[in-house]
């Protein structure tokens, strides 16, 4: 009924009882296909609402790399920013050119939850951000270091979600 390309998006929006029901009736292959398409944070949200036997079934049907990343997100305190963040975003280096950045987005963007804002990182530390609009409208030879916005508002993964909400409201981030 639903094209495979949209199934994970539809599944992620379902209520937890419907998700639980479907996980129970899916074949192993159907479950693997779904889990391969679900974004990591959606998988974590699913696991938090399922009984232990279904959690085990899901974890058995994801590859070890994804399982490790899931466990990492599950270890954040329930009310922390880390428990609701996405880890599937476009990250770039400061010496990357616009042309290289666009090629990187074309190559990896399909697997990212968000491509509208790209994060410039060095040694896992946030240096700045650039938007997709910036990349599409700037000269191909400019580097991220030349383009990136460095006056950014950031929080720790352990920051309480309420505080994150206050910052979003204060700075009009939604």
Language-model segments: residues:
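Hydrophobic packing positions in regular secondary-structure scaffolds
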Residues: 1-174
């Amino acid at each position: 009924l639903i094209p495979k390309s949209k199934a994970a998006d539809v599944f992620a929006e379902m209520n937890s009882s419907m998700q639980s029901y479907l996980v129970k009736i899916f074949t192993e292959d159907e479950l693997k296909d779904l889990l391969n398409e679900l974004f990591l944070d959606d998988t974590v949200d699913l696991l938090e609402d399922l009984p232990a036997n279904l959690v085990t079934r899901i974890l058995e049907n994801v590859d070890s790399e994804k399982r490790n990343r899931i466990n990492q997100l599950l270890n954040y305190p329930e009310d922390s920013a880390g428990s609701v963040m996405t880890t599937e975003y476009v990250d770039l280096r400061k010496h990357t050119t616009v042309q290289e950045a666009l090629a990187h987005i074309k190559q990896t963007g399909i697997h990212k939850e968000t491509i509208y804002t790209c994060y410039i990182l060095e040694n896992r530390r946030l240096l700045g951000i650039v938007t997709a609009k910036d990349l599409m409208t700037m000269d191909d030879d400019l580097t991220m270091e030349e383009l990136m916005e460095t006056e950014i508002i950031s929080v720790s993964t352990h920051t309480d979600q309420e505080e994150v909400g206050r910052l979003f409201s204060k700075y009009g981030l939604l």
